[in-house]
Amino acid sequence: MEGSISNFLSPGDKALCINGGKFGERWGKICKAFGVQVTEIKVEWGDAVDPKAVADALKADPSIKAVYVQASETSTGVSHDVKALGEIVKGYENTILVVDAITALGVFDIKTDAWGLDVVITGSQKALMLPPGMAFVSVSDKAWAFAEKAKNASFYFNFKKERENQAKNQTLFTPTVSLIIGLQEVFRIMKAEGLDKMFARQGQLAHAMREGMKAAGLAIFPKNSPSDALTTVCSPDGVDGQAIYKNLRVQYGITAAGGQDQLKGKVFRLSHMGYADRFDVITAVAATEMVLKGLGHSVKLGSGVGKAQEILMAK
């Protein structure tokens, strides 16, 4: 995230940041650390940004040089429509679109060139199924022109120098060799399944998880445009979301996550990206029902599991 700011903007440049969660908020914080003037579109947590709001902001101030957004906002479980945003930003030759696809790439289709996504970043630790430690970035010709003029200092995250080295089959600094070897296997697995089938599977798993939780009497936090990378579930009244995710781990060996900031105790989050299958979803829904029952919440055991099974059996 830092490199996608320091390599393309200079102190005093203007950026438009979509703040609809913890990681959207982070865009603004990093921009300010590099002396970039930030305009934020604050989106209620659980909502996706309205593309019209972005279009209106750029129309009001065409001097904005970059728009920063998450394709998948991990803190809320919302997916922003980066395809629509790309169409908008294409109309501004002096503005680039930068997309955080850390929990999106490998989950659903992202057409960087066709959609006009100038800079797209991701990491090894999400749908690419590897340990953390390696980041990836794609850069359009339009964005490279910005990099030639940027005046923010960057030593380790210098994309221009990295590009020069990679043209010689080298890296700027010591590479994460073990992760690169692991990435070979990841790509082999993805290629064997086929991207279209992989995206369809991820979508089916996400749909089954959401509908299974609803059938168990729980509400899904995103109001619209839920991400297929994870499901963010609202805790029932009187039940602490932190207790739910902790009991999932302690009692049933399922690693989930709690809410962040104002969502702490109010939601819990379950991932189904990467190497996940139908029975991972069924197990997660079943364990959630059992945890809720154990915490004294009224839930009909098997109600959510049955719904998830119906969806997962569909062709």
Show the residue positions of the predicted features.
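Conserved beta-loop-alpha segment that forms the PLP phosphate-binding cup at the N-terminus of a helix
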Residues: 1-16, 20-28
